[in-house]
Amino acid sequence: MKKYVFICLTVCLALGVTKAKADTSSTVAVGDSMMVLSDIISKGLPVLYIQTVDSEEPTCDYVSAPAGCMGKSITNATKVPGRMIIYQHIGEIDSVLYDSGDYEKDVSGMTIKIRGNTSAYGTKKPYKIKLQKKQDLLFRGDEATYKDKDWLLLKYDYLLTLVGFKVNALLDLPWTPKFHFVSVVLNGNYKGLYMLCESVKRNPDCRINVDKNSGYIFECDPYWWNEDVYVNSLTAPSYNFTFKYPESDEILPEQLQYMQTVVTDYENSLNGPNYTDKIDVVTFAAWCLGHDIEGTQDSGGANRYYCKYDSTGTSKIQMPLLWDFDMAEHTSFSWSRSHIKHFQSLFDNENRTFVDEYVGLWRKMNKTFFSTISQFLNSFNSSSEGRALNASLVLDGLVSGYTPTDLEEHVQDRIIWYKSRYRWLNRQIDAMNPIGDINIDGAVNVSDIADLIDVLLGSARAYRYANDVDGDGVIGIQDVADLIDLLLN
């Protein structure tokens, strides 16, 4: 997909999206040095050149959590208007992919502000960009589907997000955000490497699809104390729930009351056998497995986004995507902290539907997972986008305070880590629900043969991944024979 997006940028140019050769002769401050803009563009990545009105810089105030809460965040983030041009070097020409025009509210231009919580405390800030006119800034060739006003600039993170979204896609979660590596120049100062990314929001065409009038996107949020509107968590008051849709200044009192009931019923259900009435088990299992694959060592910051399509009784709570990989690859030989802190009640529940789905998702992908990730990373490294990113690392190091290494080293670091993680995870999940453990008692023995026959006769519940001994997707008499062979051998 990354290669596809990068090629689309080139195709857009070939189809005449750009205008005449751009004037890129202006100078840009890169750390303590000065460079010509065209030299930055020549590295190959798109360059977001942002000039705000009167060269005003986005600012924010920093706040710490009140007593009894956790984390630190920002407030009073200024929304600064300006103009944004996206340049890219194609062939021998510096060309314009996009020009927002000068700022005119609801007509042209854009605004930029600092975003994030602890991520906003570093020298390199993450930003939110809001266009005054919708545009697909990734140029995927279908403007009607992908255009939007809201975009993010996430800090370069050594390919953690690249792999994280690949895992998201492999798990077939409802939405995988798309992004592109870019260089950013703000008011004549080179800010370094970023990921220009879709934001988490309602957009039924290309992001999260919930009903416009009765749908919800919400987050179990450790930074709830920095929001004006939230609903309470009864089981974990340090993690109340805040809203992405409707936005906090648009949500009505009756909607807030409804969502308090939804959240309370959801939390209460997790300790009993009827949780399947409240949650979409497939997406919950995929989300948890995703962070277990990633080895995420952050139970607070790894954003737990939820959505509910509408307010009908048949609409279950989903977990639509993985997000925030700052603490990925931090634990090679233990479960992710989210697994332990937020999902343990589902793993321990007498209703084994969640465990069955979790194990099944892994068994569907485990044989090819490591080779898929390795091939994906190596392909990215050799792609035109990978080469452009590699060429830009030296400049990023000048402003981000690190000694740049070759992209190949970043790629191999990821591959080595996932090889180790894969081995540990595979052993742990196999032990959790062994193939052939028909009665889910943690052991495979002769009683499982009788239980599997009961499953075939319809007198026992089919835990489909444990029961499907031969892995052909069908629970049948052949599985009985294979189970006998398994026990004999």
Where are the predicted features?
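Positively charged n-region of N-terminal signal peptides that target proteins for export
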Residues: 1-4
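Bacterial N-terminal signal peptides
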Residues: 7-16
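Regulatory N- and C-terminal appendages and interdomain linkers associated
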Residues: 12, 23-107, 385-434
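Middle-to-C-terminal accessory/interaction subdomains
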Residues: 45, 56-58, 122, 242-434
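Conserved oxyanion/phosphate-binding beta-strand-loop segments in alpha/beta enzyme cores
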Residues: 82-155
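Internal "kinase-insert"/substrate-recognition segments embedded within catalytic cores
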Residues: 130-136, 144-158, 172-177, 189-289, ...
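Short, well-structured beta-strand/strand-turn elements
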Residues: 171-183, 296
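Cellulosome-associated attachment modules in secreted, modular CAZymes
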Residues: 430-489
